[in-house]
């Protein structure tokens, strides 16, 4: 696919993302509505133990995926990322489908974040129409990406810094509450893990059922692959960012879910559930309310709003760059390949903004229903992208070795090959196919829910095989793979 680093007279993407930008994108890029808003649903539906185990398993899977992506991105740092790798090391139609799938994934995720902004703002302004907030925040995201890649990087750096600091404070307060040393609190210990059907409410099927929501929480981790195409010294900075992933997963997700489950019973109706109308108060806010910090709860809601803007900002960046790359390769209308003087693909940005604007439909159909529908749809397409990363890395490494290249020449090498990509592929596949399987066992099948859950699979296959049949493409043989000694 396109190489953004060739020197031409025409404007090109600029490598203006510094090491600190890339590091904060890796640490905080995926800390958003999935963790702050939707995490309560996982505890409510699967129980504290089921939710925690789901986060641990998927967190391990994501870590393996990021080591795979780190190896690929450090070797070939392009904004097309795994869509480029899928084309070069698997099959051209496969890369084409991955690119469009990922663009759709983030375009929908922006809409999800805008819906979440309505829910957060209703905490303070319950009588204000939600579409007003969506329009305002969509405009902010648009402007941050319209200015320059540095504008995106700086905004994401400070957004992520606020989120990271907040989660650390949340963990400290939560631990103090659990052990009973917080002022006015009684130690909770592990008592909430023994009520009703806890800790594994619903058993294995419930864990599979919430896995897609957990997957949505981790979406954005792969943004370092997209940002590689505009980062300074990617061979050095990408490995550094990848090494941050494990500790982020351990601290920001696993610890946060554990603390929420220890303080708030999974039977608490305030947690996000399908039959609860008010989902504007997140589990993080509820924890501060339990601590008696009522003013801090309002501050936490503001932080959640920052997280929503951050996730939407990242989504706007990722989808715009992917659409630009597709256009440069002739796989999308050429108009989207045009860059501004500052190296911003603004036509691609305009198109993505229009699609994200469909979130305004939520004011017509009801926030909760549309929010959960978009959440599941986006989660499925995200898993497909991760499957693409695992497959691309496996074939990349196999081809690299078969052609006699020295692994020591790789700027970064995943230490878990072939276990890492195989484990990630198998777990991704199980969750993708097993999601919402209980719908088929019911007396009456809810085809609306089934469609929302699985629509990403047929869309991906139609795009892939439609391109393959039209263009007559075939799988790339190991002997035909191109491995330049240094990609500039």
Language-model regions, residue ranges each:
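Membrane-helix boundary/coupling elements in multi-pass transport proteins
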Residues: 78, 101-116, 213, 218-231, ...
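C-terminal membrane-solvent junction of multi-pass transporters and transport-like membrane proteins
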Residues: 158-159, 336-343, 386-452, 481-485
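Membrane-interface loop-to-helix entry segments
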Residues: 131-189, 219, 242-246, 250, ...
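Helix-loop-helix connectors at the membrane interface of multi-pass transporters/channels
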Residues: 9, 83-93, 114-134, 166, ...
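Membrane-interface "cap" regions at the ends of multi-pass membrane proteins
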Residues: 1-40, 44-49, 63-67, 79, ...
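TM-loop-TM module centered on a large, flexible mid-protein loop between adjacent transmembrane helices
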Residues: 84, 91, 123, 197, ...
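Helix-loop-helix junctions that connect adjacent transmembrane segments
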Residues: 7-13, 52, 125, 129, ...
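Extracellular loop-to-transmembrane helix junctions
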Residues: 13-14, 38-137, 141-143, 248, ...
